[in-house]
């Protein structure tokens, strides 16, 4: 009797045909093929590789690889384990081209193979391949997972899950790798050898794939597209990370919070959020970080490096996302549109903060006094009132600031610098926010509208104060007399009636005033033409 070949009993579907089957049809296919495999195993038949090369040479992946992966999806793990173990004894993984079966066994041999190869690796890299611990007898089949893989790389990566071993130790940092190729690539990061240099910004790279991905940050090319939503990406890693949003699944899952990840490195970085581990330390200031990219970005605050330059105006940035956000100033692109009022924003973060003006959500609460805020910068700014400290301090007046941008704006109050000039009237301002608000006096724009009465306002603060007329809210209460106010400015003016403070002094006559409006009215009396409004009425 002729030997039975796999092709004699196989019920095959192409990838396209398989995708069209419903779940019940797929289950029927699995049942039939499991029974077929069981029968072959029971009579001791091996799968032959007759005409495999010719028959499948135009296929991207081997037929048997597809079949095994489909069978592995069965719910009955005891069924697949038993069948796979029988075929493994017949060297199934060697008989099926392109497929390796994970046996979850710790081998006694040096895992890279022949001793001559290991000597060669040691001579060239100076790194001794590790040996797996010898366990003696083969483990029980029930503890083996038999998961199939179509590539050696995927198979070796998966084995690490069972063995916990990696093959090569880096002598510089102690990091371990499971292949010579990967440790060679890693060693370059210590040597500083970066032969691939970007012609646009001069940034150098140690590996061609990283260099090509970087080039796309300048060209805008995004060759990898999500099949689910059409979103495009510059590298395959980004699209894999994105796909988790659609599938909700990844090969690595956090045991603490359940978040899935597409790669081992991303998963390990995430774990440090829970453990608090920060192994990457800045040599300049000692600040520690959970991953090396974050450290590299931080180091630019010390070096002043700004590798990302705007082609339109030449402004340079330390971070690529900052450049991308800046470019929208030139293009006018505002992809984030508020459904409530139609206002559009350049960045997702400012859009989210804006949405809270409609919902009233204030997720950030001060631990000292309980006051709540809609965004972190507002809370940090508030915290300075309690601590009296901030990372940035004015050298002239000693005022502390929570972030660099308001600190820079404040410095201009001392230097007199006003870099933002109104195109309509020529008036200059210290910040971009101030000029945007001022421009509304020319355009008449009033983006903040009261839902109660329809009245519109140019400024958010005016709108918020107006809303309190309807709600009756008066959050600022005087501790001396109990009088309450809607706005902090009105409250501060009132406090001066108790303290007697008069911070506005006339240089002409020395007279002092408690509020700016009274002071400005007084100053008109010293003007050359006198006050602008004079009563012309003559008594009879």
Swiss-Prot record:
This is Zinc finger protein 136. The keyword Transferase does not apply. InterPro entries: KRAB, KRAB_dom_sf, Znf_C2H2-type, Znf_C2H2_sf, Znf_C2H2_type. Keywords: DNA-binding, Metal-binding, Nucleus, Phosphoprotein, Repeat, Repressor, Transcription, Transcription regulation, Zinc, Zinc-finger. A zinc finger (C2H2-type) spans 140-162, 168-190, 196-218, 224-246, 252-274, 280-302, 308-330, 336-358, 364-386, 392-414, 420-442, 448-470, 476-498, 504-526. It comes from the Eukaryota. Residues 4-90 form the KRAB domain. Pfam families: KRAB, zf-C2H2, zf-C2H2_4. May be involved in transcriptional regulation as a weak repressor when alone, or a potent one when fused with a heterologous protein containing a KRAB B-domain. The modification Phosphoserine is found at residue 191. One of its GO terms (cellular component) is nucleus. PANTHER family: RIKEN CDNA 6720489N17 GENE-RELATED (PTHR23234:SF10), ZNF44 PROTEIN (PTHR23234). It is found in: Nucleus. One of its GO terms (biological process) is regulation of DNA-templated transcription. It comes from Pongo abelii. One of its GO terms (molecular function) is zinc ion binding. Belongs to the krueppel C2H2-type zinc-finger protein family.
């Amino acid at each position: 009797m002729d030997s039975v070949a796999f092709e004699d009993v196989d019920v095959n579907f192409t990838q396209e045909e398989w995708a069209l089957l419903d779940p019940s049809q797929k289950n029927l296919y699995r049942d039939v093929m499991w029974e077929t495999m069981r029968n072959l195993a029971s009579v001791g038949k091996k799968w032959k590789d007759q005409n495999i090369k010719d028959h499948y040479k135009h296929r991207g992946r081997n037929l048997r690889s597809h079949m095994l992966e489909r069978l592995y999806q069965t719910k009955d793990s005891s069924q697949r384990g038993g069948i796979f173990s029988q075929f493994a004894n017949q060297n199934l993984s060697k008989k099926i081209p392109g497929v390796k079966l994970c046996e979850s066994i710790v081998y006694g041999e040096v895992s890279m193979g022949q001793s001559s190869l290991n000597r060669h690796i040691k001579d060239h890299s100076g790194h001794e391949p590790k040996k797996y611990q010898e366990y003696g007898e083969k483990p029980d089949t029930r503890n083996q997972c038999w998961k199939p893989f179509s590539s050696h790389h995927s198979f070796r990566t998966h084995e690490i899950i069972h063995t916990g071993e990696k093959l090569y130790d880096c002598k510089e940092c102690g990091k371990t790798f499971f292949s010579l190729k990967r440790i060679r690539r890693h060693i370059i990061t210590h040597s500083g050898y970066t032969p691939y240099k970007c012609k646009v910004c001069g940034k150098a790279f140690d590996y061609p794939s990283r260099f090509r991905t970087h080039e796309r940050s300048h060209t805008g090319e995004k060759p990898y597209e999500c099949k689910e939503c059409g979103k495009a990406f510059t590298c395959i890693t980004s699209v894999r990370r994105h796909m988790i949003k659609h599938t909700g699944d990844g090969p690595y899952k956090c045991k603490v919070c359940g978040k899935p990840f597409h790669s081992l490195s991303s998963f390990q970085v995430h774990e440090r959020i829970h453990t608090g581990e920060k192994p990457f330390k800045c040599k300049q200031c000692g600040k520690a970080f959970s991953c090396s990219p974050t450290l590299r970005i931080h180091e630019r605050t010390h070096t002043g490096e700004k590798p990302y330059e705007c082609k339109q105006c030449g402004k340079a940035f330390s971070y690529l996302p900052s450049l991308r956000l800046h470019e929208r100033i030139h293009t006018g692109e505002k992809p984030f549109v508020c459904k409530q009022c139609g206002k559009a924003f350049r960045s997702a973060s400012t859009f989210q903060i804006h949405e809270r003006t409609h919902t009233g959500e204030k997720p950030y609460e001060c631990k000292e006094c309980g006051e709540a805020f809609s965004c972190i910068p507002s809370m940090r700014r508030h915290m300075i009132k309690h601590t009296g400290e901030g990372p940035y301090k004015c050298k002239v007046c000693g005022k502390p600031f929570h972030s660099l941008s308001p600190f820079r704006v404040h410095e201009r109050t001392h230097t007199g610098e006003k870099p933002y000039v109104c195109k309509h009237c020529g008036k200059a301002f210290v910040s971009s926010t101030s000029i945007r608000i001022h421009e509304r006096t020319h355009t008449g724009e009033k983006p903040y509208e009261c839902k109660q009465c329809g009245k519109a306002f140019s400024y958010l603060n005016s709108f918020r104060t107006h809303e309190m007329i309807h709600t009756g809210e008066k959050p600022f209460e005087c501790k001396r007399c109990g009088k309450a106010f809607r706005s902090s400015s009105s409250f501060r003016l009132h406090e001066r009636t108790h303290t007697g403070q008069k911070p506005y002094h006339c240089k002409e006559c020395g007279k002092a005033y408690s509020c700016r409006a009274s002071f400005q009215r007084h100053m008109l009396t010293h003007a050359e033409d006198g006050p602008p409004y004079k009563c012309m009425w003559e008594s009879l």
